[in-house]
Amino acid sequence: MDLAKGEWRDKSPDRILFGKSSLSPTLRQHLALQITYREKIARKYPSLSSLFLPEGITYEQSSGEATARYKAETFAPSPFLVDGTGGLGIDFSHLARGAQRAIYLERNEDFATAAQYNIPRIMGESYSPARIEIQQGSLLDELERLVQNGMEMLYFDPARRAQGGARTYALADTEPSPIEVCHTLQRLDYQGRILIKVSPMEDIKEVLRQLPSVGEVHIVQSSDEVKELLLYIPTLSTQSEATPPSLIAVQLSPEGLVVNRFCGTPAEESEHPHHFASALGHYLLLPGAALQKSGLFHSIGITYNAIPLHPNSHIYTTDQKPSHFLGKCYEVVRVIPAKSSELKRLNQVYPEADFSQRNFPLKPVDFYKKTKIRPGSSHRLIGTTLLSGESVIIEAH
């Protein structure tokens, strides 16, 4: 039964809850919740409008279809996959398509019950009850059994809310703790792979310090935002055995295809010389969110044959336009000193403009107020600071 369609499609949650109906109070509550979530479901899961969302699901933490497809393309297949924090089942359903055997494990009974309804609908023809198992239980409690049964890949997405409901981003405070899970698996002599989804707010350096076995950090950008950090552990190791990790920044299309990709390592970053531009080239490069999150700012310059303008600007310049850049590339038209006298008459040349800034004394709202320029798309202006300390406004297109 699709609760968000049919005769209930155009009714408000309040009318469903309090209007006349033959539905039971329990079913009314479930139906009102589905109607409330309907627009969010359509936006985040455009091909999955019939999903049933149980009350209490951490909707904002659930993966979208694009990032779920990326995980499946990058880390599948597996002979025996376990999703230890099943949740809504989006990631599980995509990863399980390439698995010979797959277990969805969820500690919350309502979520596990909803998964019985959702997963066959998400997986479609690739769903097979002979190889797909939906179980209720705690990952930490079940680890020993799963390892003994031959688990080859473990995926989990720790809850980022403390018991009181407040958000938490520290690895040790998420549930289950990736640190505790990895320690337990080491004790059990687990030889398989691990994939952990953590908050985009995590400090990558701190994560690598706490989890030395991480071989790859995937920084996944979709719709100009970093949506996920994925920690890939090909095999558990000690601090002394660990190999230098790779940081992989990717930009996804709405369909989950990789549009742009960048790869570097903290070890390489420390070896690159620190050069800064003395003058602007023909093009201006503004790294996207995933590139910025990597923190590999000198490696970015080497990869794209570009030079940063300033240590704190994270804007690059080059005379050669890169064929594939994970960010925005503009042609430099004009450079204007950000002096008070110039700002006062700027609206005579640019009555309307789209203004953005990095390492610039004026925020956009203050810039528009001071210059009396109207926000719009007629011109593109970028405020920044050069290595000399001079603040400038760059017209670009």
Segments from the language model and where they lie:
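SAM-dependent transferase fold signal centered on methyltransferase-like domains
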Residues: 1-397
